[in-house]
Amino acid sequence: MAKVEFDFEQIQDVPTFYRDFAHKFALDEGFGANLDALWDVVTGDIGLPVEIEFTHLNARSKRRFGAIILLFEEAEEELEGGLRFNIRESSGEPAHHRG
């Protein structure tokens, strides 16, 4: 299973997350950089299986990126093993793993 990590020490805002996501998954410039486009890509366009891990996510970042986190949690359920989504807090300890 491929693993793709998003380091929130380097991602300060939502537009930066979308740019990083598009780069890591080699999406073309037509990627909409919004929740609907992200859902479409995650559930239909990226190679599965894949593990996506958010690292260095503090409480403030969890609030800022809450909708994106929820999207990945829902996609993890929908894809039934095709996607594993994890969050590691700033301490390095796993904060979330359901897969």
Q: Predicted regions span which residues?
A:
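Positively charged, polar, low-complexity stretches
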Residues: 1-99
